[in-house]
């Protein structure tokens, strides 16, 4: 039971990333078919609010980032957008340092792993963005000439990259704010419901402004648009916010965001199969470097959880009866 409890945060985050990957594939499909990104955001949060509200009421008695990410993905490919979005853990880590949710001791191996992992992640992003390389002829694609016809020119790629990057920063700020809020408002179900409700209201305002004079965008039929709205609302907004909040309370925002590469891997495979999206060597190498960097961060965070810094370390040191014992315990803890 203790082992299962320890592994539960990892299992939940892996399953959540698989769920996110399905949403990204469906979202890319409906965007290619002309669905408004603003209307999609409204419906998604509306569904999530309806689903979460009864549970929050019984048990308990971030729209800007999503719009920018979806808009960026519209100008590029699903794989590229997800891979670029993997800077999220690095950005979250930097913001967590600023807001004192994370600590770094340069003589500590675990702190060095987090710093090196963050730098490695940024390096992987640069490789993926600047280096294209030859096309990879995967056995399930039609060959090197197969390409996604949406957003393949250089100007669209740059525009998409900028939008996704801004969206990434916005979502990192949201994660930090959620972590701070959970310290004083520990009801995860209620918080997730409020996030979805406020997201719906904000999304309606943005959609009415951006889609002014175009009421047809609100029409939804029995097609992939309805499937995308329902799936993303229940799995990615309702469950996503709730599970993220539960795990974040014990492991922190950096741990939650560090699992994004799993979503990228699933999206890359599914996109190449479903959309016949071309894979390039440069992006594959960059994605590999990103994964290495991010899991260095995960390792460092795991050690943080195993050997917490403050206030547990201070309490442990206070229990030492002699200065020699204090020095010995401090040396052991800080060397990990």
Swiss-Prot record:
SUPFAM superfamilies referenced in this protein's UniProt entry, alphabetically: Multidrug resistance efflux transporter EmrE
| Topology versus the membrane | Multi-pass membrane protein
Give the transmembrane ranges. 7-27, 45-65, 79-99, 115-135, 160-180, 189-209, 227-247, 255-275, 279-299
Domain EamA residues, every copy: 63-126, 169-298
Pfam families xrefs = EamA
Species the sequence originates in: Arabidopsis thaliana (Mouse-ear cress)
Instruction: Report the subcellular localization.
Output: Membrane
Q: What Gene Ontology terms describe where this protein resides (cellular component)?
A: membrane
Q: Does the keyword rRNA-binding apply?
A: no
Q: What InterPro entries does the record point to?
A: EamA_dom, WAT1-related
For this UniProt entry, the molecular function terms from Gene Ontology, in alphabetical order, are: transmembrane transporter activity
- State the family it belongs to: Belongs to the drug/metabolite transporter (DMT) superfamily. Plant drug/metabolite exporter (P-DME) (TC 2.A.7.4) family.
Q: What keyword terms does UniProt attach to this protein?
A: Membrane, Repeat, Transmembrane, Transmembrane helix
| UniProt entry tagged with the keyword Cytoplasm | no
Its domain of life reads: Eukaryota
Record's protein name:
WAT1-related protein At2g37450
Residues annotated as coiled-coil are none
């Amino acid at each position: 039971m203790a082992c299962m409890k320890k592994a539960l945060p990892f299992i939940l985050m892996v399953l959540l990333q698989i769920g996110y990957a399905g949403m990204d594939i469906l979202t890319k499909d409906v965007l290619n078919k002309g669905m408004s990104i603003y209307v999609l955001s409204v419906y998604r949060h509306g569904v999530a609010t309806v689903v979460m509200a009864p549970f929050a009421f019984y048990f308990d008695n971030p729209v800007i980032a999503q719009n920018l990410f979806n808009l960026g993905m519209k100008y590029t490919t699903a794989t590229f957008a997800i891979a670029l979005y993997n800077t999220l853990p690095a950005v979250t880590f930097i913001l967590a340092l600023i807001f004192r949710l994370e600590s770094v001791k340069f003589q500590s191996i675990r702190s060095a792993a987090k710093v090196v992992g963050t730098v490695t992640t940024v390096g992987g992003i640069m490789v993926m963005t600047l280096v294209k390389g030859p096309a990879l002829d995967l056995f399930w694609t039609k060959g090197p000439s197969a390409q996604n016809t949406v957003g393949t020119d250089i100007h669209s790629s740059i525009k998409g990259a900028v939008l996704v990057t801004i969206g990434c920063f916005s979502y990192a700020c949201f994660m930090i704010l959620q972590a701070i809020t959970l310290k004083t408002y520990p009801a995860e179900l209620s918080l997730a419901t409020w996030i979805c409700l406020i997201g719906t209201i904000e999304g309606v305002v943005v959609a009415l402004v951006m889609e002014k004079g175009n009421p047809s965008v609100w029409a939804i039929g029995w097609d992939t648009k309805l499937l995308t709205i329902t799936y993303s609302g229940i799995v990615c907004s309702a469950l996503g916010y709730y599970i993220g909040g539960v795990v974040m309370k014990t492991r922190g925002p950096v741990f939650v965001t560090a699992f994004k590469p799993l979503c990228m891997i699933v999206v890359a495979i599914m996109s190449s199969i479903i959309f016949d999206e071309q894979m390039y060597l440069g992006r594959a190498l960059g994605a590999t470097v990103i994964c290495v960097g991010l899991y260095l961060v995960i390792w460092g965070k795991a050690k943080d959880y195993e050997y917490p810094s403050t206030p547990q370390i201070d309490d442990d040191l206070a229990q030492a009866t002699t200065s020699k014992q204090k020095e010995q315990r401090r040396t052991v803890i800080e060397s990990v």
